[in-house]
Swiss-Prot record:
Pfam families: Denso_VP4, Phospholip_A2_4
Cystine crosslinks: none
Domain of life (superkingdom): Viruses
Species whose genome carries this gene: Junonia coenia densovirus (isolate pBRJ/1990)
Upper taxonomic lineage: Viruses, Monodnaviria, Shotokuvirae, Cossaviricota, Quintoviricetes
Biased composition (Gly residues): 379-390
Coiled coil segments of this chain: none
Keywords: Capsid protein, Clathrin-mediated endocytosis of virus by host, Host-virus interaction, T=1 icosahedral capsid protein, Viral attachment to host cell, Viral penetration into host cytoplasm, Viral penetration via permeabilization of host membrane, Virion, Virus endocytosis by host, Virus entry into host cell
Protein name (Swiss-Prot/TrEMBL): Capsid protein VP1
Subcellular localization, as worded in the UniProt entry: Virion
UniProt feature, compositional bias: Polar residues: 348-366
GO cellular component: T=1 icosahedral viral capsid
Cited function: Capsid protein self-assembles to form an icosahedral capsid with a T=1 symmetry, about 22 nm in diameter, and consisting of 60 copies of size variants of the capsid protein which differ in the N-terminus. The capsid encapsulates the genomic ssDNA. Capsid proteins are responsible for the attachment to host cell receptors. This attachment induces virion internalization predominantly through clathrin-dependent endocytosis.
Amino acid sequence: MSFYTAGLIHRARPGYRIIPESTATEDIELGAIGEETPLLSEGAVTAVEESAAVGLPELGAGLAGAIGTHADVLYRNRNVFKSVLTGNYTDLKGNPLKQRNAISEKTKQLGRGIFQGDFNRAFPDDLKLETEQEKKDLLRYYNHNRRLAGLSEAYPQGKGYAYAKSQKVLEAERRGLTVPGYKYLGPGNSLNRGQPTNQIDEDAKEHDEAYDKAKTSQEVSQADNTFVNKALDHIVNAINLKETPGNAFGAAIGAIGIGTKQAIEKHSGVIYPSVSGMSRQINSKYLNSWHDWIEQNKHNNFEGIQLPEDFYTEEQTLSDSPMSEGTKRKADTPVEEGPSKKGAHNAPHNSQGTDPQNPSSSGATTSXDVEMAMSLPGTGSGTSSGGGNTSGQEVYVIPRPFSNFGKKLSTYTKSHKFMIFGLANNVIGPTGTGTTAVNRLITTCLAEIPWQKLPLYMNQSEFDLLPPGSRVVECNVKVIFRTNRIAFETSSTATKQATLNQISNLQTAVGLNKLGWGIDRSFTAFQSDQPMIPTATSAPKYEPITGTTGYRGMIADYYGADSTNDAAFGNAGNYPHHQVGSFTFIQNYYCMYQQTNQGTGGWPCLAEHLQQFDSKTVNNQCLIDVTYKPKMGLIKPPLNYKIIGQPTAKGTISVGDNLVNMRGAVVINPPEATQSVTESTHNLTRNFPANLFNIYSDIEKSQILHKGPWGHENPQIQPSVHIGIQAVPALTTGALLVNSSPLNSWTDSMGYIDVMSSCTVMESQPTHFPFSTDANTNPGNTIYRINLTPNSLTSAFNGLYGNGATLGNV
């Protein structure tokens, strides 16, 4: 017996079947075959052996002759091949063999929930089910999926299951019938067996993939014809010495196999592979009365035509008929064509006058004919009742008008170069007398990075061009320490010496403002013989300030003056530092604040909130990289809500537990015995001060603004960012420890930093009114203001700013 005959008989043993690659394993039910019924007759075996033995001379004469030689034998054994290829086992007469009852869908769903696809685990013997039969069915489901996953060395023996004794047999089943030396040439193979061995094996793989995707008998036949044509090309090329004989051998085997299959299927219909579509027979009453119309339209499977509900009858085995389940359009079946095609195809008229308007071939109109005509494609269905009947048609949804205004995101990035000073710590303030509370400041070297102000991110033009409703959604700063410089005198007196190896420390901090221990100040005076010791302070400087200790403002400092109307444009030194990439100074430094005679117990430990570095080890390193997303980053006046509807004065609205008024907390200063916090309410208003949305206002405004007419808000403040060079002592030969002499001699020191600043601004200009000249929004997105102005130049309390007055000159 040949290899192919043995393989075919092996595959025909009871209990075996070929599993298509695309079939879901959990939906495959392997039933038992029952008794050992022989499936192959000697005629079928002889046909297979003789087909495999056909040589090149016979192929040269034509494959049709070889197939025709055994056509009778192949037809008589068509049920054998159908059983082997599909797993639907029958006897030689085509009668189905007794099979085990299929596992119910309920059991499958239960199995999916228990095992979750993991069949490597043991079956839970203690599982409690309603009936013993359910447990048996669940065990069958479990064992079946283990076999499919290759987790079982042998099939469980017993009634209802065929078995294999080794993993080798299981692997052979997955492999299917393949020609030696090939991976895909043969029926029933998986699609993932690796790279094909040669060109004919590649053609066989493409043929298998076409099978896997086939949904109709036409697609199956097309795949077969394509493969046979390619196989014949390989044979001809081999005869002309254009290809190797190996390709010709494989091509011959493949062509004979497919040719044999096609010969069988001419009598039995397509039996392999199993396709999803099922043909339906046309109702006999339409076959008789619409015969000519059907003949004219069946070539395109009645594409785009609304067919009567009873046009087809019971399902039959799929054959070469061009009409299939897929050609019938139901009302709930989605299609790609537009609504204009639904029922819009008029049936053509034939030469004999028979048409869907009057399908009766005799010309006599009966009640049945009228009923059929009313359901006919292209006719006014139901017109006899006074209107168009849309039964069976797809629902047509009319598109609604909609304007998507979208949101524009713009990113503004700047690169600044700053110089900072190694300022000494010094306690400054007026002299206190008696029990009077006197202000005290202790200066630090921590320079403030003003990242809460817009000029760090954008120039005046960029700000002015932003439309109403623009808001910052994210801002980021990166602080890179470049290096530091320590200066000393080389011709000093005998009491001072120059030193080249001083230690220089660098300090950074994020969020000091939330501590509430201090404030940022600008230094206005220094000790005459010690320029690193500040002696006087004033409020921090951001905007232009006039006077001897004034400041031209961040905009002019970074970007220069306007050449059209700024008198300072031509002044010496008023050049734009950012525009030319040069260094400028940071104006404000952090100071701790305290009052005397308040019983607070001295200065808190600021150092525990600082990060300190040896400056020699962090040159050209990014020491701070922080991002902040404002909760209310509105930087332009908000969009308006245009009140319409009746009445425009809405009256009193019940809002439940929503807050209508903004809440405030009145905090009384120490001592502890007199501290108190009381609640205050503030009405919301749509009146906005002019300076609330200028370029120098703080980005975060959640303490001031409220989204919507009521609701809950949790305001927050933007954390501060500081960096500083610690003061470097000036060493002397004097006895500094004598009489506890204070260390008040400092070497001039400076640091150089780069600040990369970036902010993202969102803008949108929606409108709901066709003639509105400004953008508008709905009430829920309208911004209201609390009639209270927190002061960010003061110290925070519990993470928020109060509305106290700014500290004056100290």
